[in-house]
Amino acid sequence: MASILDEYENSLSRSAVLQPGCPSVGIPHSGYVNAQLEKEVPIFTKQRIDFTPSERITSLVVSSNQLCMSLGKDTLLRIDLGKANEPNHVELGRKDDAKVHKMFLDHTGSHLLIALSSTEVLYVNRNGQKVRPLARWKGQLVESVGWNKALGTESSTGPILVGTAQGHIFEAELSASEGGLFGPAPDLYFRPLYVLNEEGGPAPVCSLEAERGPDGRSFVIATTRQRLFQFIGRAAEGAEAQGFSGLFAAYTDHPPPFREFPSNLGYSELAFYTPKLRSAPRAFAWMMGDGVLYGALDCGRPDSLLSEERVWEYPEGVGPGASPPLAIVLTQFHFLLLLADRVEAVCTLTGQVVLRDHFLEKFGPLKHMVKDSSTGQLWAYTERAVFRYHVQREARDVWRTYLDMNRFDLAKEYCRERPDCLDTVLAREADFCFRQRRYLESARCYALTQSYFEEIALKFLEARQEEALAEFLQRKLASLKPAERTQATLLTTWLTELYLSRLGALQGDPEALTLYRETKECFRTFLSSPRHKEWLFASRASIHELLASHGDTEHMVYFAVIMQDYERVVAYHCQHEAYEEALAVLARHRDPQLFYKFSPILIRHIPRQLVDAWIEMGSRLDARQLIPALVNYSQGGEVQQVSQAIRYMEFCVNVLGETEQAIHNYLLSLYARGRPDSLLAYLEQAGASPHRVHYDLKYALRLCAEHGHHRACVHVYKVLELYEEAVDLALQVDVDLAKQCADLPEEDEELRKKLWLKIARHVVQEEEDVQTAMACLASCPLLKIEDVLPFFPDFVTIDHFKEAICSSLKAYNHHIQELQREMEEATASAQRIRRDLQELRGRYGTVEPQDKCATCDFPLLNRPFYLFLCGHMFHADCLLQAVRPGLPAYKQARLEELQRKLGAAPPPAKGSARAKEAEGGAATAGPSREQLKADLDELVAAECVYCGELMIRSIDRPFIDPQRYEEEQLSWL
């Protein structure tokens, strides 16, 4: 058989697509140009399947991409549309004349029911090849099946509903399990539930649909030729109650609610629209004699599942007396009617025919039309051909329909991704609201459009709707981009003017107090809105001018605070002499620059509070920039003025640890003028090191001298290390102070002696106090009695110096005795050294014949060797080789030089006479051989190479010379 459903050909007949009449909108409000660059694809596109059946097609069903068609009376063709080139033929095995009446395929595409005209029903499962008759169903001509979408699976249908031509509704359940020869039958049970009646008695059950709502309620809609019945109820709990028995039992005593229409086609058909597989259906369409009953399905309603119902009459030429419709399918916004020679699509929103698709006569009359809910594709067939409809972008023009119906919310929903259409909808909605005098809503819509700003603003001005105009301006402002600064400035200024004008008009009216407060709150909300902050900040100058022109000082301050323009706020308070409020603003916002600017004003009026604020600011303030304000304030010299300045400067120095010289100098000047008792304490606390004090020493000296603070001057002299000046000035104040100064140059004994002589001269010549002069001798060991005697007058008797002279003589005698003792100790030490040298000359060591070199492990006596006191023995050449790497470069050079000279020196001559002659000749020529050997020994054998310092220094030396590391590494490869 040829490949099926994988190749398509273009439709042999052209579909007539009828565009619904739409009012011309002319030039759009926004200026958008809907430039359609590509040809619009039709919503419904028909394609003929490249398939020629071997026999007449009697029935066709599609679900979940599974297609089943009956050919002739005994063949079933099954096709998985995902594998269209692998069709499956199943023989029904019927030898009688029974024909296929209808076929039913569940939502999973797994369970197929074949109703025969002989009142028999066959069951075929997707995963099996066996056709199984349903014995319990025999005798019933099945017209409809209501599948159980909630409980149905590939292996079981769950409880389902079956409608017959006799008006009976049965409940059944099918299982795909074959179970062998003696296994259970596929029809687990088949029991009657209800009988549908019309006026003449039982009527065929044309359609059955069963659904379960989100709240657990069950809904069943059943149709006959003229009636549509609804069964609504909640299923009982338990496994047995999963079926529909309880639902239908509730209508035993009274009939269910139904809709009835008088005209009769002889049949009817019900179609549901379900957005997604296994989701709740959204809409229904019932094809009956009077037309198509269309509406929404609302599972939340207690008494009826149907809502928003309306009957669409059949298009012209369609109906019971003309060309009756054979089938109906429902999409999101259309229902399609199948006639014998054509398909007509009707918009469910307007009732207009949007498609009239005629079929060629060569294919024969159309039989039926079905929809695959899983893919949304529509299938129609004749006895000799199969056609498929693709539905593409069905909602593309729905927005225009809703727009014409003034259902703007739905119109916006369906054109949200099309800016040009959305702008048109918004403009129409804004115009509609404006005509309805809903000005605020109109302003909100206009703000979202691209309509001309000037026209809209003028429109509201002419209508004197300032509130709506403000709403429009605010929303336009919020939609501006950062680069649109000019527009933002215009809008913010205009809005401010509108608010101020409205506040001014309402302020004097006591009856409009509530409105005034509301407007005031709206204005403040506008000024403080984070969305507008950037634009308001850019326009703050013009807004301040507007506020000033209206005299609205309250909002001027409020706006300045919002814009963080605290300088303007503080200046306003200062101008109105509200200094404490100005300081409160400064303290709250902690801006150092504002403190620097306004401190000169505030310190004249609230000095204590301002200093408290400075202290609260701590290190955030630079005290140097506050000195000018303090200087101007403290020039009056009043105690309170100076004390506040001192309080802040002390805080800077003692708490903040300021080291800036200007601060310390100013504090010194304050102390010198207003608090001299703290001056000396400050100087002493600062220390006596000239490099560690933070004030200017020369300035401090001049300042203290000007104000006559001599003790402070003495301290500064000491810091400057001008000890003579310090002693001279201290002698004018206090001799004890001078003594303290004289002891300061500890390392310069000559200067100390000189200073003490100044003190002694002053005591002797100025105070004429001999006892105090003698006390000076005791205080300074550098002074002798002979140094002080010249200061005394001639008439002074020796009795005053007797003790001092005796003490001096005793000191000299003690010094002489110390010198003699040191000389004796030096002589004894020299004698001990001579004795040790004599003992060292006689020391020796014993070498045994079997002793070996500590380095090469060869017999020691074979070559010249060295013997160390530690016991280690080395050949001379081995020791030389071991010592050389550890010597510094200059010693290595010296070693090579000694070796070269020793090699060039003549060997020692035999005999004493010849030896003496050789020594004499060598002495004249250069160092002797013995001298060279001695130098070499001193260089090489000064200490044992294993026990000496050389071994200790070698502990961090690498085992392999870095210069030979690569060579050594390669040798191991």
From Swiss-Prot:
Membrane topology: Peripheral membrane protein
Chain positions found as N6-acetyllysine: 362
GO terms under cellular component: actin filament; AP-3 adaptor complex; autophagosome; clathrin-coated vesicle; CORVET complex; early endosome; endosome; endosome membrane
PTM sites of type Phosphoserine: 3, 11, 13, 689, 912
GO biological process, one term: lysosome organization
Residues covered by region (Disordered): 903-929
Coiled-coil parts of chain: 454-481, 802-848
Keyword Phosphoprotein applies: yes
Tissue and organ distribution: Ubiquitous. Expression was highest in heart and low in lung.
Residue ranges of CHCR repeats: 618-772
Keywords assigned: Acetylation, Autophagy, Coiled coil, Cytoplasmic vesicle, Endosome, Lysosome, Membrane, Metal-binding, Phosphoprotein, Protein transport, Transport, Zinc, Zinc-finger
Zn-finger (RING-type) residues: 853-947
Superkingdom per UniProt: Eukaryota
Presence of the UniProt keyword Cell membrane in the record: no
Record's subunit section: Core component of at least two putative endosomal tethering complexes, the homotypic fusion and vacuole protein sorting (HOPS) complex and the class C core vacuole/endosome tethering (CORVET) complex. Their common core is composed of the class C Vps proteins VPS11, VPS16, VPS18 and VPS33A, which in HOPS further associates with VPS39 and VPS41 and in CORVET with VPS8 and TGFBRAP1. Interacts with RAB5C. Interacts with HOOK1. Interacts with STX7, MON1B. Associates with adaptor protein complex 3 (AP-3) and clathrin:AP-3 complexes. Interacts with SYNPO2. Interacts with PLEKHM1.
Function according to Swiss-Prot or TrEMBL: Plays a role in vesicle-mediated protein trafficking to lysosomal compartments including the endocytic membrane transport and autophagic pathways. Believed to act as a core component of the putative HOPS and CORVET endosomal tethering complexes which are proposed to be involved in the Rab5-to-Rab7 endosome conversion probably implicating MON1A/B, and via binding SNAREs and SNARE complexes to mediate tethering and docking events during SNARE-mediated membrane fusion.
Protein name, UniProt field: Vacuolar protein sorting-associated protein 18 homolog
Organism: Homo sapiens (Human)
Gene: VPS18
